[in-house]
Amino acid sequence: MASQGTKRSYEQMETDGERQNATEIRASVGRMIDGIGRFYIQMCTELKLSDYEGRLIQNSLTIERMVLSAFDERRNRYLEEHPSAGKDPKKTGGPIYKRVDGKWMRELVLYDKEEIRRIWRQANNGDDATRGLTHMMIWHSNLNDTTYQRTRALVRTGMDPRMCSLMQGSTLPRRSGAAGAAVKGVGTMVMELIRMIKRGINDRNFWRGENGRKTRSAYERMCNILKGKFQTAAQRAMMDQVRESRNPGNAEIEDLIFSARSALILRGSVAHKSCLPACVYGPAVASGYNFEKEGYSLVGIDPFKLLQNSQVYSLIRPNENPAHKSQLVWMACHSAAFEDLRLLSFIRGTKVSPRGKLSTRGVQIASNENMDTMESSTLELRSRYWAIRTRSGGNTNQQRASAGQISVQPAFSVQRNLPFDKSTIMAAFTGNTEGRTSDMRAEIIRMMEGAKPEEMSFRGRGVFELSDEKATNPVVPSFDMSNEGSYFFGDNAEEYDN
């Protein structure tokens, strides 16, 4: 694990990177949450939403998406320059759901982006408050991670769908900054790099000229971000090789896929933060809670406490199970899509099931879905314990694995052995150790071979009672090892489509 000297904490990424003490960081993150809350309250007023409608997660997603779209400079420029029929580049909107005569109705709203930007800035003391925007992007990304399995995207870049535990943050926009880069999984970074290299192979001018220089520096920056996620010298050396390549091509793609596979056992450090929907922050601010004054952290007890006291509702389709919908959103709130289900069940206090066993589709409702049969219900987002989020990959460990996901990416800093299917993973590493990176490959394979199943990760770390705000009495959980640990277990989750 890199020393704290070289890596800023997430809260510092979330703030402006100035070195701050814990109190300043908590106040600064609190200020960001206050801004989102104030914006949400104002939008609910504009849209004339009742209290219940304002707590509907589908309305929250639409409002969040509107402000993200209003601030998407590149896309806005693109829309101005490439006008498409029936799309006004200056407007943004989406479906808002209201309760009319005992039925849920969909209403499409349209606003000037300029107006949305004005409301957002006003809620954030005149600032653009990019951190608040990034926070919402990460919440959307975490929701996508729990809802969809990115099989197709993995296969397209030549990776294996069973590597899905490496794909955290794969739907985050490019513009999500340092805080966004921190939460991206190893597989996500590898996929972005492979896409880039493939473009270079197909387009002679990709690395050339004025633009090519920018492209090259973006490539090297991404390589460095990925290198920073790896915890072993050999994996990092391999990233140096990829970064320094004069003309990145298939050899680099091979190396990248190799390093991604190795991360199933020699896991990278990926940050986890509990980012909640705006409809949680809004009512809290409305009730008079001052996040800046009280201080807030995305990686401690605060999000758990907030969810203990929040009412959030969701639209439910006719054959969906509200408890399953709740689990989906709960996992998203805690950035836990790739965490061990045995641990999640312990923290939540109710059984957390694999994605394929859940009778629920995504949270968003498509525009062609019939509203007549829509019901709504309360999402159960409370927990039995809380635990500190981690950005370490933990030590490695193995367990009987599923046909689907064959490793986990820990979200909580809690003692356990980390499951992965060693025989399946190692089978992919036969014989391919030639070429420039052969010594590193051999070293990486040696370390993977040496990974022990019984090794504990996060030794001595436990979960805490919700009354234990200072984390003084850790409860080290015991697990039923016979249970399945993987969420995307031989899975049939829907595919994510833009």
From Swiss-Prot:
Motif (Bipartite nuclear localization signal): 198-216
PTM comment: Late in virus-infected cells, may be cleaved from a 56-kDa protein to a 53-kDa protein by a cellular caspase. This cleavage might be a marker for the onset of apoptosis in infected cells or have a specific function in virus host interaction.
Segments carrying motif Unconventional nuclear localization signal: 1-18
InterPro entries: Flu_NP
Biased composition (Basic and acidic residues): 8-21
Membrane spanning residue stretches: none
Region spans: Disordered: 1-21
Biological processes annotated in GO: symbiont entry into host cell; viral penetration into host nucleus
Cellular component GO terms, alphabetical: helical viral capsid; host cell; host cell nucleus; ribonucleoprotein complex; viral nucleocapsid
Keyword NAD found: no
Keywords from the named record: Capsid protein, Helical capsid protein, Host nucleus, Host-virus interaction, Ribonucleoprotein, RNA-binding, Viral nucleoprotein, Viral penetration into host nucleus, Virion, Virus entry into host cell
Record's keyword annotation contains rRNA-binding: no
GO MF assignments: RNA binding; structural molecule activity
Subcellular location(s) per record: Virion; Host nucleus
Top-level taxonomic group: Viruses
Short name of one Pfam family: Flu_NP
Family of the protein in this entry: Belongs to the influenza viruses nucleoprotein family.
Purpose: Encapsidates the negative strand viral RNA, protecting it from nucleases. The encapsidated genomic RNA is termed the ribonucleoprotein (RNP) and serves as template for transcription and replication. The RNP needs to be localized in the host nucleus to start an infectious cycle, but is too large to diffuse through the nuclear pore complex. NP comprises at least 2 nuclear localization signals that are responsible for the active RNP import into the nucleus through cellular importin alpha/beta pathway.
Subunit structure: Homomultimerizes to form the nucleocapsid. May bind host exportin-1/XPO1. Binds to viral genomic RNA. Protein-RNA contacts are mediated by a combination of electrostatic interactions between positively charged residues and the phosphate backbone and planar interactions between aromatic side chains and bases.
Protein's name in the database: Nucleoprotein
Organism the protein comes from: Influenza A virus (strain A/Swine/Colorado/1/1977 H3N2)
Taxonomic lineage: Viruses, Riboviria, Orthornavirae, Negarnaviricota, Polyploviricotina
